[in-house]
Amino acid sequence: MGFGSDLKNSHEAVLKLQDWELRLLETVKKFMALRIKSDKEYASTLQNLCNQVDKESTVQMNYVSNVSKSWLLMIQQTEQLSRIMKTHAEDLNSGPLHRLTMMIKDKQQVKKSYIGVHQQIEAEMIKVTKTELEKLKCSYRQLIKEMNSAKEKYKEALAKGKETEKAKERYDKATMKLHMLHNQYVLALKGAQLHQNQYYDITLPLLLDSLQKMQEEMIKALKGIFDEYSQITSLVTEEIVNVHKEIQMSVEQIDPSTEYNNFIDVHRTTAAKEQEIEFDTSLLEENENLQANEIMWNNLTAESLQVMLKTLAEELMQTQQMLLNKEEAVLELEKRIEESSETCEKKSDIVLLLSQKQALEELKQSVQQLRCTEAKFSAQKELLEQKVQENDGKEPPPVVNYEEDARSVTSMERKERLSKFESIRHSIAGIIRSPKSALGSSALSDMISISEKPLAEQDWYHGAIPRIEAQELLKKQGDFLVRESHGKPGEYVLSVYSDGQRRHFIIQYVDNMYRFEGTGFSNIPQLIDHHYTTKQVITKKSGVVLLNPIPKDKKWILSHEDVILGELLGKGNFGEVYKGTLKDKTSVAVKTCKEDLPQELKIKFLQEAKILKQYDHPNIVKLIGVCTQRQPVYIIMELVSGGDFLTFLRRKKDELKLKQLVKFSLDAAAGMLYLESKNCIHRDLAARNCLVGENNVLKISDFGMSRQEDGGVYSSSGLKQIPIKWTAPEALNYGRYSSESDVWSFGILLWETFSLGVCPYPGMTNQQAREQVERGYRMSAPQHCPEDISKIMMKCWDYKPENRPKFSELQKELTIIKRKLT
């Protein structure tokens, strides 16, 4: 197999091959040039980062820190990586790229040489085998005519007896020319035959084989170039691997348990002797009736001591109850953190638990403070009880002197203690609250589908809906539906309302048959149809009978097969978000729910869809449907082309005009006014949770934290992760969410909008921002922000919720501002 033996008549294909290879080499050359540029820029960026860090790290703590050592080594190794990448880029330029450029020129020369030789030998072959033979054949035919003419004239001369010799001479001459030409033709024909054989058997194959040899040599050269490129650009070379090994080793040397040992040694202070708190006996120098550390029981104090004892007993009991609640909250949070820790996939996922761990430590501090208060109240109560019991049944002795002073002092002490208790009681009030479920319900009524339909097509099959949502759908005796277990994918459950209770029966699958406790069936629809039509009890013990199938809301239910997942758009709180396509070619956004999420998070995932089902507004992201027929569950939303508002602001900051920013704010106000009218509290209003659609229409999105409350107020335990910089003080302090707290968040959204995507409270941590707000601090308006907008922000950030404007007022004010800019 080879060019010479198999490609004799494939000249055009060979030319196309060479053209294609030249284009490929040009593409490779362009790619390598861009790779060199990219690597140089990457190396330069790394070096700039290291230089910047060096400037910012000039101030060092005066103790030895393993974290600092590790960080310093990471910077040093990053600098080393920068130098390596720069060297690699230079080697790539002087090596593979330079050789590839030379090879392209050689390739072009080979092509040119091949075309020239091929044209030459082909022209020679055509000349010998066609052109020259055709000329001889034409002359041959002409001489035959001339000879025949001379022959006829010779015969005529013989017949007439005139000029016979002359005619004979002409005849002989014509015959001689013909015979000589005949010999030339025979020789030329023989030569043409041999030339043709030589052309196809030797000359052309030799040219093609020569071309193939050069082609293969160039492939060999290209392979060498690729090999050198691979070695130079490899990220697993020994020098690069060593860089990362050094970094990894430095990270492994970080030991949280010993990190602060040196710091403690450097800054250790000797324990100061505690000052003893004793009764100041100098107070008694001018009074003989009072004794140090003794409760005075007499006719003036006996009654007040009883009141104080009763008050202290009540205070102690309340403190003990608070302490019990706090300790339960500690145990609950510890359990929650432990469960979350088990689901962490990466070491860095521990960051997600830090806020919860901080909340746990704060709870423990509160517990300790309450224990201290309990011990104090107990000691005070014991002291009072001892004095009261000592004098039980006795008549209080009279006080001769300073009755009024004694009464005043006693009264003041009582007031001080009561005041102190009140301050303690108020400081710990509202810490422990129970979260409320906010899942709604929907009314459904339809008849059962025939058992021949697949399970997913049965009206009474609701897919992987949460247990609590299934229970809300069951209202009357005999109401039933089938669902996939939310906690155990692949397991199916029959949910029934019977005798005032909502019962849940796992559908058993044994020996390829579905059953409860009686007859088995090959599929679930047949099993349910049997119990529904025959009214046979589900189990003898329960006596439950199926009467009313509860159909699913078909308006929103989609099949997984109706959606084709496309590119990954990003990651949400519960799973990935993809671009998808419906059967009618509609582009949508598909939110997925990870199958390994805890049950409570899966319920929250579907909560967003349940809320959005009820809404239809141009400034609220639209729900298309949900896919709950099997795991993983999908929420299908309209695809909003502009992406999230925060990224949009940062990307378009040089293009956005003031009028457009006001329009965005007005859109947000309109959307929130609509939500307020539906008694919906968003709880997480921020630029990152808004989307920008066609014609720059802003839409409120991400209802994962939202709640619907008839009273317009939602209480939270306060132990969950919340967006602190966007959340109102009353929500942070007491877990009280309302439309007024959403107004506070709207003010932060305004600040984000007119700062073009800057993070609120720049330079502050969450805790610092929270403390500053409590002290009365409010962010100043962003640069170029209109004064009217700044005033609206300040109104939104009024500490008292009742003083904040309504969304209807905000919409009116923003409309006026927009008109002024027109």
From Swiss-Prot:
Membrane topology note: Peripheral membrane protein
Active site: D684
Compartment list: Cytoplasm; Cytoplasm, Cytoskeleton; Cell membrane; Cell projection
GO biological process: actin cytoskeleton organization; adherens junction assembly; adherens junction disassembly; cell adhesion; cell-cell adhesion mediated by cadherin; cellular response to macrophage colony-stimulating factor stimulus; cellular response to reactive oxygen species; chemotaxis
UniProt EC number: 2.7.10.2
Description of how activity is regulated: Activated by phosphatidic acid binding. Activated by hydrogen peroxide (in vitro). Activated by reactive oxygen species (ROS).
Domain SH2 as annotated: residue spans: 460-550
CDD domains membership: F-BAR_Fer, SH2_Fps_family
Residue positions, PTM Phosphoserine: S434
Entry PTM: Autophosphorylated. Polyubiquitinated; this leads to proteasomal degradation.
Coiled-coil regions listed in the entry: 123-185, 301-390
Domain Protein kinase: 563-816
Tissue spec: Isoform 1 is detected in normal colon and in fibroblasts (at protein level). Isoform 3 is detected in normal testis, in colon carcinoma-derived metastases in lung, liver and ovary, and in colon carcinoma and hepato carcinoma cell lines (at protein level). Isoform 3 is not detected in normal colon or in normal fibroblasts (at protein level). Widely expressed.
Gene Ontology MF terms: ATP binding; epidermal growth factor receptor binding; lipid binding; non-membrane spanning protein tyrosine kinase activity; protein phosphatase 1 binding; protein tyrosine kinase activity
Enzyme class of the recorded protein, top EC level: transferase
Span of domain F-BAR: 1-259
Any single Gene Ontology cellular-component annotation: cytoskeleton
Keywords from the named record: ATP-binding, Cell junction, Cell membrane, Cell projection, Coiled coil, Cytoplasm, Cytoskeleton, Kinase, Lipid-binding, Membrane, Nucleotide-binding, Nucleus, Phosphoprotein, Proto-oncogene, SH2 domain, Transferase, Tyrosine-protein kinase, Ubl conjugation
Pfam families linked to this entry: FCH, PK_Tyr_Ser-Thr, SH2
Top-rank taxon: Eukaryota
Residue ranges of the region described as Important for interaction with membranes containing phosphoinositides: 1-300
Subunit structure: Homotrimer. Interacts with ARHGDIA, IRS1, JAK1, NRP1, PIK3R1, PLEC and TMF1. Interacts with PPP1CA and regulates its phosphorylation at 'Thr-320'. Interacts with CTNND1, EGFR, FLT3, PECAM1, PDGFR and STAT3. Interacts (via SH2 domain) with CTTN. Interacts with HSP90; this stabilizes phosphorylated FER and protects FER against proteasomal degradation. Component of a complex that contains at least FER, CTTN and PTK2/FAK1.
Recorded domain comment: The coiled coil domains mediate homooligomerization and are required for location at microtubules. The N-terminal region including the first coiled coil domain mediates interaction with phosphoinositide-containing membranes.
Role according to the record: Tyrosine-protein kinase that acts downstream of cell surface receptors for growth factors and plays a role in the regulation of the actin cytoskeleton, microtubule assembly, lamellipodia formation, cell adhesion, cell migration and chemotaxis. Acts downstream of EGFR, KIT, PDGFRA and PDGFRB. Acts downstream of EGFR to promote activation of NF-kappa-B and cell proliferation. May play a role in the regulation of the mitotic cell cycle. Plays a role in the insulin receptor signaling pathway and in activation of phosphatidylinositol 3-kinase.
Protein name as annotated: Tyrosine-protein kinase Fer
